[in-house]
Amino acid sequence: MKNHSFIFFCYNGFMKKIIITATAESIEQVEELLEADVDRIYVGEKNYGLRLPHNFSLDELTRISDLVHQAGKELTVAVNALMHQEMMDKIKPYLDFLQEIEADYITVGDAGVFYVLQRDGYKLKTIYDASTMVTSSRQINFWAKNAGVSEAVLAREIPSAELFKMPEILEIPAEVLVYGASVIHHSKRPLLQNYYNFTHIDDEKTRERDLFLAEPSDPQSHYSIFEDNHGTHIFANNDLDLMTKLIELVNHGFCHWKLEGLYTPGHNFVEIAKIFVEARDLIEAGKFSSDQAFVLDEAIHKLHPKNRFLDTGFYDYDPDMVK
């Protein structure tokens, strides 16, 4: 493989630098990720945050906010749940709390939350996160214009051929998942519990139970599934790893990378974060090469959980295959 170097370029000047957001499963891991030099920490609590490695208490979120800001970094808190009316009735005290601890961003996907934020004059910056539904530049621009959204989380099912067209129209920065488990379906219904009831099975439904679905025609397929107070969550067959695609992403304006640790617990996730930080620094210095990308990618594969597999997801798909 030829050792080509690349020049750092961020399309349309959306971001002055590459931003790495990482999830966290504990206060100790927050400290380790800050030491690793990630830019943002992504956390939340049980009632309003979806698919988090850990549900923190309000006291823990306060402590995390202090740690993040003392390190000169930013805090994003998940408020991206699909809301029922009773959740909306109780959301104001939580938004008050997030403003009090000075959360830098909150992720929001429900129109009702945007309404409350605007109606009551909250100063919280928002990131539009409607999961698998965020596939259109114009959709994102709508929320930027009408709800004051600062950034957006892109769906993971967008092929690169379609992805690279988006910055020409996008008016705000967009986050791309570059590592970790990728959700492909969320239902508010208790699908696992319904299955257990039908089959008379008594079993756990949690993420830690490590349940998965397999296609009848492909017994090797592995779609992770778990159920919690927000319903049922199903994930892609393989986890995502875009280390070898980072230069392409940056050169097309995608300078906000997300690292998802939902199925990569403990120290290994921190080590993987360090690898992406190294890639970020090399790219920004104009010293990143295809050989380095290959070496770093191999290191990620060694740290990734042995019972899970990595690929580039929909990145190289023909757009006609996913319409």
Predicted regions and their residues:
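Intrinsic-disorder-associated, low-complexity terminal segments enriched in Asp/Asn/His/Tyr and depleted
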Residues: 3-4
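Acidic-histidine catalytic/liganding microenvironments
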Residues: 146
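Conserved nucleotide-cofactor-binding alpha/beta core module
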Residues: 137-138
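Active-site pocket-lining/capping segments in soluble small-molecule metabolic enzymes
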Residues: 12, 16-132, 153, 160-323
